[in-house]
Amino acid sequence: MEKVKPWLGEPQNTIAVLQKYGFVFQKKYGQNFLIDPHVLDKIVAAAGIGPDDFVVEIGPGIGTLTQYLAYAARSVCAVEIDKNLIPILEDTLSDYDNVEVINNDVLKVDLAALAKEKNNGRPIKVVANLPYYITTPIIMGLFENHVPVDSITVMVQKEVADRMQTGPGSKDYGALSLAVQYYAEPYIVANVPPNCFMPRPKVGSAVIRLTRHEVMPVETKDEKLMFSIIRASFNQRRKTLANGLKNCLLYTSPSPRDGATS
């Protein structure tokens, strides 16, 4: 079956689909659909999607980015929490036989098992236009649960992308910066203005690619302890480090110095 070129990226086509189904945006899901083909092409290119790739897309919406991914990849699994979008996805993706849609909360999906089943356990690529309110739990969940991921290429709030990529000495440097950079190398691909979305978000956005480290930059015996110390340290910036560590999660053993080695 010859793949059909993506067509949903054009604003008029998005509007037509929304009107056809009388779709009402759900604020609780943070829905902002991309309507710029150039940005969509840039996301797929940044993710390095090729004909051998199995891709997991989080939050496909009406299937706009999904079409672009399906056109480039071997297969796509799209996880959508909003049941009202499922009939729309069945329509907009009907020309693509390499897409599977799962109606579920991605935080409840065993992506490691999915990778094992669909990709023979090989690292997968994750691509998403993420709801901004749940960006950090999703990204850190992928890393902390040790899902076999090659890279994560996502649209996020620009402020969050800056925090992920920034280095020591910046006012934006914090626990999120350290956590993301422990697992991956972040690279901001592009800044995306509000007019590239429907409806327009109130904040600027950015596409960021997180490439998983082949070798971890730090060896640790206890990731949970290490990140507890990191969070406590940054939460107590105006207090002494000793007081910050004292307020860390109630670990009595081992000693904090045993939690990480360089």
What are these regions (language model features)?
Residues 232-253:
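C-terminal lobe and adjacent flexible extensions of AdoMet/dcAdoMet transferase-like proteins
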